[in-house]
Design a protein with these regions (language model features):
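The alpha/beta-hydrolase serine catalytic core
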Residues: 1-99, 104-123
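Alpha/beta-hydrolase-fold serine-hydrolase catalytic core, especially in secreted/extracellular enzymes
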Residues: 125-127
Length: 127
């Protein structure tokens, strides 16, 4: 089985502005501030290009095992609608998308961790 937390397939399509893409093309890397630490987030052109070549959401995703997707609706990095789109594209019939209304990108609060552990436990019970 698979558990995804704030899964962001195809983020190179929607996660970068035209200005970001231009900077990547001209400078080979992009430095962005992040709320998750003091150091900037570094994205290299090679990383971005590999993401472009590995896009998934254009068609069916050939995954047939049970999948659980956890997504915070207050996530500023990955819009929660992305989890729904991913769920639609997965070939598996055993897909559940769990939205945490006040959850952020990390889903790291005690209640979020409890949800993750419970989700893992119930998924393991199905295998």
């Amino acid at each position: 089985g698979i558990v995804g937390i704030a899964a962001a397939p195809d983020f190179t399509e929607w996660g970068f502005s035209d200005a970001d893409k231009a900077l990547l093309a001209t400078e080979g890397r992009l430095l962005e501030p992040t709320p998750y630490g003091d150091d900037p987030l570094v994205t290299t052109l090679a990383f971005w290009q590999s993401g472009q070549s590995l896009r998934l959401l254009g068609g069916e995703i050939a995954i047939d095992c049970p999948v659980r997707l956890l997504q915070g609706q207050e996530d500023r990095d990955v819009p929660w609608q992305r989890a729904l789109r991913l769920a639609q594209r997965l070939r598996s019939y055993d897909v559940q998308t769990l939205l945490v209304k006040d959850g952020d990108h990390r889903l790291s609060r005690d209640g979020d961790i409890a949800l993750l552990i419970g989700t893992l436990g119930s998924l393991l019970d199905t295998l």
